[in-house]
Amino acid sequence: MAKAIKQLQVGQLVRSLAGHDKGQYYLVLKVAGVKVWLVDGYKRLPANAKQKNPCHLQESKLISADFAAKAQAGNLRPEDMRACLRALLSQQADELNVGKNPDEEALANV
């Protein structure tokens, strides 16, 4: 039984599940067929985007419309990529912490 191909979008936050970059977060720069090109604004820029199989990625629901618009226009700067990535990671962390009581967390660590 074949795995369903993930429907990724430009500007979507993803995490690498396999390879030497396992655990690394990226933004989707381009989707073509069964390959995805990823950037992070640090080591991976559009000129040397990471090519990855979508099966090796954990997708997030978070998408940066600002990143997608700049990628479409072709004027992405490293600082823009880093800012978008930081914003999405911060938003993801906030969503994970919603509804948690800090006092309960402190008691759980005792």
Labelled PLM ranges:
Residues 1-10, 17, 27-110:
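Ferredoxin-like alpha/beta domains used as RNA- or RNAP-binding modules
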Residues 19-22:
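Short, charged beta-turn/beta-strand-edge "cap" motif at the junction between a beta-strand
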